Amino acid sequence: MPKIKTVRGAAKRFKKTAGGGFKRKHANLRHILTKKSTKRKRHLRPKSQVSKGDLGLVVACLPYA
């Protein structure tokens, strides 16, 4: 039985947490930042958890995480 390939794009975007979840970065913080408020940018800064509905997709992309 061959090994399952990891989706490399997902491996770079998600990190496994000790509790079995996954950390992810928020979108909308790369460019065109002048029109976004300081509060909005500040709230986008910290990492977030992958939601329960998306967790199955992330787990399927990262079989060895």
Swiss-Prot record:
It comes from the Bacteria. The keyword Cell wall biogenesis/degradation does not apply. InterPro entries: Ribosomal_bL35 (IPR001706), Ribosomal_bL35-like (IPR021137), Ribosomal_bL35_CS (IPR018265), Ribosomal_bL35_sf (IPR037229). SUPFAM superfamilies: L35p-like. One of its GO terms (molecular function) is structural constituent of ribosome. One of its GO terms (cellular component) is cytosolic large ribosomal subunit. One of its GO terms (biological process) is translation. Keywords: Ribonucleoprotein, Ribosomal protein. PROSITE patterns: RIBOSOMAL_L35. HAMAP family: Ribosomal_bL35. Belongs to the bacterial ribosomal protein bL35 family. This is Large ribosomal subunit protein bL35.
